[in-house]
Amino acid sequence: MTIADVAAEAGLSKTAVSMILNERTGTGLSQETAKRVREIAKRLDYRPDPSARALRIGTTPTIGFVSDDVTLTRYASAMIRGILDVAEENEHTVLLAETGHHPERLSGALNAMLDRRVSALVFGSMAARRVELPQLPSDVPVIMVNATTFVDYPVVLPDERTAGEAIARLLIDAGHREIALIGRRYDEDLPPEVSVTISDRFAGLDAVMEEHGLEWAWEEAFDYWAPDDGYRAAKRALSSGARFTAMVCLTDNVSFGAYQALQEAGIRIPDQVSIASFDDDEISTYLRPQLTTARLPYEEMGRTAMSLALDGNRGTDRHLVPMPIIRRGSIRSR
């Protein structure tokens, strides 16, 4: 049914019916008449034409979400769930597009969404890094989630510094003073195209160690945070003769490798060495003992980004989302 059908049955003009159904003031009609029009529209199963609405107001109740590879990774469900939940709560729909790190796909996806008159755009990345976006219209709000760009759009990122502080403090409060750090990356080796947040993670760890007058008992840097890297680094830490009762691994994947090296050497976790990590990857629950880790808050970042998009936020603020510490069995008090 069309608005003309509703108007004909109500005995009113299409303009008057449109104003009532769009809850606009100034119709000059009584509340009883407005109620009757809504009842007729419901009975006739009238649905507004989104294309007509878009032509009238310039946008649709639709948000565009474009990512580099979020939808193809294990992190997809949490971030997208957060985005979709907030959109649904506010009666909006979401268009999803994946670029696979191809610049030509990125431009095409963004243009396609702009052609559909989305009311805002959200760009998301699996790794918190700087990305290059094409020039976008100034009248469309753009929100960056787990990513930054060269334009000062609102940014939603995990609060890595506070998480680093919390992990270091957790081990120190448990009585550990000799702590190894596995997976260091230095700023000069960590361009923003790789990460814009990991340096904050190190800063938080280092700040708490310094606050307590402590130095790392063993420290090793490497370029990738894969299980093999964690395994080899932990083996070298053990063979170095360094004394440590706890270990911080920069990711759960690194922790997985460190677990293997320690357990091969007959070292019991956490009885002899406690381990804490970051990310809360699925693997953290399969390790034995289960791994204590700081969770990357993908769902909450998605929710925050969508809320900003719905608000039409055009500021330049950086919104930091807390990383909760998930306490499991890999830390023992001394």
PLM regions with names:
Residues 43-49, 104, 123-126, 231, ...:
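Short gly/ser/thr-rich secondary-structure transition/capping motifs
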Residues 2, 57-169, 173:
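Alpha-helical recognition/docking segments in bacterial nutrient-uptake
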Residues 25, 71-72, 101-102, 128, ...:
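Glycine-/small-residue-rich active-site loops that bind phosphorylated ligands and cofactors
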Residues 34, 77-81, 202:
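Short amphipathic alpha-helical segment that frequently serves as the phosphate-/nucleotide-binding helix
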Residues 1-61:
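N-terminal helix-turn-helix DNA-binding module of bacterial transcription factors
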Residues 43, 85-90, 138-144, 148-334:
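Bacterial carbohydrate/catabolite-sensing allosteric modules
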Residues 16-19, 56-70, 178-191:
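Short beta-strand segments enriched in small/hydrophobic residues
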Residues 13, 61, 119, 177-178, ...:
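Short acidic/polar active-site loop segments enriched in Thr and Asp
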